[in-house]
Amino acid sequence: MNLEILAQLTALAFIVVSGPLVIALLAFRKGNL
């Protein structure tokens, strides 16, 4: 497998996972306030 493709897939997966995670974290912190 090409290393460049693997890096792009890793970055894409990181964005897909971190997006909802950041939103959930913000909602959780707002709920606590």
From Swiss-Prot:
Q: Where in the cell is it found?
A: Plastid, Chloroplast thylakoid membrane
Domain of life of the source: Eukaryota
Record key words, sorted: Chloroplast, Membrane, Photosynthesis, Photosystem II, Plastid, Thylakoid, Transmembrane, Transmembrane helix
Q: Which residues form the signal peptide?
A: none
Q: Which GO terms describe its cellular component?
A: chloroplast thylakoid membrane; photosystem II
| Disulfide bridge map | none
The family line of this record is: Belongs to the Psb30/Ycf12 family.
Subunit info here reads: PSII is composed of 1 copy each of membrane proteins PsbA, PsbB, PsbC, PsbD, PsbE, PsbF, PsbH, PsbI, PsbJ, PsbK, PsbL, PsbM, PsbT, PsbX, PsbY, PsbZ, Psb30/Ycf12, peripheral proteins of the oxygen-evolving complex and a large number of cofactors. It forms dimeric complexes.
Provide the protein name.
Photosystem II reaction center protein Psb30
Q: What organism is recorded for this protein? A: Chaetosphaeridium globosum
Supply the gene name.
Answer: psb30
